[in-house]
């Protein structure tokens, strides 16, 4: 989902309605798990009811159909690559067996260099370098009680550094998954 544009549409004339629909997918674990929820719902609708229904469903939920379609195409290419190299792919979106913690641990294993903790001053700081960071206003975590530890996928430089695509983590996961860090 990080390889495609933002999946959410927020037309200015229907901002409140769009925000309400988007909240159906949001979880306090962060943006990446929220994106996963959107994609799994899309994939389920596509498989169960077809492309035309899925287009309508995306429209009523203020989601970008073409962006989700592109993400699905990328998943198909990834599956083909796995198969070509002899790896089996277990389709888990039908009955998501992996827990949110399992998925977040996977995220930590890839994004551990982007770990940050909440400093007592109320500002996040990077584990390496102690650089001050803030949550981007588009993050679902922006309006929630700040999590103690997070990883982020992207930084945006404005007058301050803003974290985007954030996932809440447990600090013990860093010790296990990235002890070298």
Task: Set out the residue ranges of the language-model regions.
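Second RecA-like catalytic domain
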Residues: 1-181
């Amino acid at each position: 989902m990080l390889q495609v544009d933002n999946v959410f549409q927020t037309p200015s004339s229907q901002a409140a309605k769009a925000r309400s629909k988007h909240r159906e997918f949001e979880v306090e674990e962060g943006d990446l798990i929220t994106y996963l929820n959107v994609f799994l719902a899309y994939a389920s609708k596509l498989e169960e009811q077809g492309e035309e229904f899925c287009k309508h469903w995306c429209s009523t939920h203020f989601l970008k159909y073409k962006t989700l379609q592109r993400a699905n195409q990328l998943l198909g290419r990834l599956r083909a690559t796995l198969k070509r190299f002899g790896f089996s792919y277990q389709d888990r979106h039908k009955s998501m067996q992996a827990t949110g913690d399992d998925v977040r641990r996977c995220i930590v294993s890839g994004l551990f260099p982007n770990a940050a903790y909440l400093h007592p001053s109320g500002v996040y700081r990077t584990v390496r370098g102690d650089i001050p960071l803030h949550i981007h206003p588009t993050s679902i975590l922006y309006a929630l009680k700040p999590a103690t530890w997070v990883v982020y996928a992207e930084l945006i430089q404005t007058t301050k550094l803003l974290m985007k695509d954030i996932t809440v983590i447990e600090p013990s996961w860093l010790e296990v998954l990235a002890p070298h860090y």
